[in-house]
A protein has these predicted regions:
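DPxDG-like acidic metal-binding loop motif
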Residues: 96-122, 137-139
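Phosphate-handling active-site elements
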Residues: 76-87, 111-131, 257-270
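Glycine-rich beta-strand-to-loop/alpha-helix junction loops that act as flexible
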Residues: 100-101, 244-249
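Short hydrophobic/aromatic beta-strand micro-patches
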Residues: 252-254
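Conserved, helical-rich catalytic subdomain that frames metal- and/or nucleotide-binding sites
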Residues: 54, 140, 146-241, 256-262, ...
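ATP-binding N-lobe of GHMP and related small-molecule kinases
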Residues: 1-96, 114-122, 158-161, 170-173
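Glycine/threonine-rich beta-strand-loop-alpha-helix active-site module
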Residues: 117-157
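Short, basic/glycine-rich phosphate-binding loops at helix/coil junctions
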Residues: 50-62, 108, 129, 204-213
Length: 307
C-alpha cells in the first residue's frame, strides 16, 4: 500500500514593528506588532496514519513537547482524526525571533486540517492560539498587524511591502524569550505599529520605513551586545531600515534592490556570522480555499506564492 506522505513548508516571520503596551493579569505582555512571512522555511514531511499516535523526528534537538508534536496531537485528540509521523528538516535558526518552532507547529496544523478537514476556522485558530502566540499568524502567513499576545490578526494587503526584501543576520548565541520578558520593565519604548499601519494604508513607504522598530531591542542588546553591533553595521550597509525580529537575536535590514541586499550579505558571510541570508516576503494562503494551495499528492503544496 502506498504511504500517504506529504511535504509542507514552515515559513519564518519577521516582526517589522513590535510594541509592548503593558503586562496583563495573566502574566503575558500585551503586544502590537506588524509581522511579515518570508521565504525562509523548515521542510516538513508528514505521513498520515490510521493509528491514534503522533511521532516527531528532526535533524536538530527537539524540546520536549515540541509545538509540532502538540499541534498534531491536539488536532487528533479534539477531532478523533488519525495520527501522523512527522520529520522536520530545520533551516530556520532557533532562538532567533523568527518563529521557528511556531512555524513548524503552524505547518503541521495546516497539513492536518488540509488532510482530515475536521475543524472549522474558529476552532482551528483557537487551537493555534493555545499552541503559541505566533502560531495563528503563521497558519496563513502574508502580512498582518497582530495584537494581544499576537493572536488577534488584521491582515494587511501587500502594497509597498511587496517590493521589499530582507537581509537576515543572526549572531551565534540566541536569546530566551522567557528570560527577556521576565526582565522587561516599564517604561516601554514608544509605540510605532499603529503609525506604521497607517503608513501602509497610505502607501507611504518613507513613513513606514521610519516606523520599523522593536521595543525589545534595548533589553535584548543588553543581554547580547552583538545585537547592537550587527544593527549598527546593518544601518551602514545601504539598507532602507534595520531592526531586530521578535525577541532576537536575529536582525534584519530592508532593501528594495535584491542585488544590494546580496552585496551587503557578502560582508557578513566573510565575517563568519552564524546565519545570514536574503529573503523575499510571501503572500498569505487560505487553508479553507482549495484553489489557494496547489496540492500535489506526495510533493506537497505551493504554499505562499513568493512575491
Amino acid at each position: 500500500m502506498m504511504k500517504n506522505i506529504q511535504q509542507v513548508k514552515a515559513f519564518a516571520k519577521l516582526n517589522l514593528t513590535l510594541d509592548v503596551l503593558g503586562k496583563r493579569d495573566d502574566g503575558f505582555h500585551e503586544l502590537i506588532t506588524i509581522m511579515q512571512a518570508i521565504d525562509l522555511y523548515d521542510e516538513i514531511s508528514i505521513e498520515f496514519t490510521s493509528k491514534k499516535a503522533v511521532s516527531v523526528a528532526a535533524d536538530f534537538e527537539l524540546p520536549e513537547g515540541s509545538v509540532a508534536f502538540n499541534a498534531a496531537n491536539e488536532y487528533m485528540q479534539r477531532t478523533g482524526s488519525g495520527g501522523a509521523n512527522i520529520n522536520i528538516k530545520g533551516r530556520i535558526p532557533p532562538m532567533a525571533g523568527l518563529g521557528g518552532s511556531s512555524a513548524d507547529g503552524a505547518a503541521v496544523l495546516r497539513a492536518m486540517q488540509r488532510h482530515y478537514g475536521l475543524m472549522d476556522r474558529p476552532s482551528l485558530y483557537a487551537l493555534a492560539a493555545q499552541l503559541g502566540s505566533d502560531v495563528p499568524f503563521l497558519l496563513e502567513g502574508g502580512a498582518a498587524i497582530c495584537r494581544g499576545r499576537g493572536e488577534r490578526l488584521e491582515p494587511i494587503s501587500a502594497g509597498i511591502l511587496a517590493g521589499l526584501c530582507y537581509l537576515v543576520v543572526k549572531p551565534g548565541p540566541g536569546i530566551s524569550t522567557a528570560q527577556l520578558f521576565a526582565g522587561l520593565r516599564p517604561p516601554y519604548a514608544g509605540a510605532k505599529s499603529d503609525e506604521a499601519r497607517l503608513a501602509l494604508q497610505a502607501d507611504d513607504k518613507r513613513l513606514f520605513l521610519s516606523c520599523i522598530s522593536n521595543a525589545l531591542e534595548p533589553p535584548a542588546a543588553e543581554l547580547l551586545p552583538s545585537i547592537g553591533h550587527i544593527l549598527k553595521r546593518l544601518r551602514r550597509c545601504g539598507a532602507l531600515a534595520a531592526g531586530m525580529s521578535g525577541s532576537g537575536s536575529a536582525c534584519f535590514a530592508v532593501f528594495d534592490d535584491k542585488n544590494k541586499a546580496l552585496a551587503a550579505a557578502e560582508g557578513f558571510v566573510d565575517a563568519g556570522i552564524d546565519f545570514c541570508g536574503v529573503f523575499n516576503p510571501i503572500s498569505g494562503f487560505d487553508i479553507y480555499n482549495k484553489q489557494d494551495l496547489c496540492y500535489n499528492n506526495g510533493s506537497g503544496w505551493d504554499e505562499g506564492r513568493i512575491r
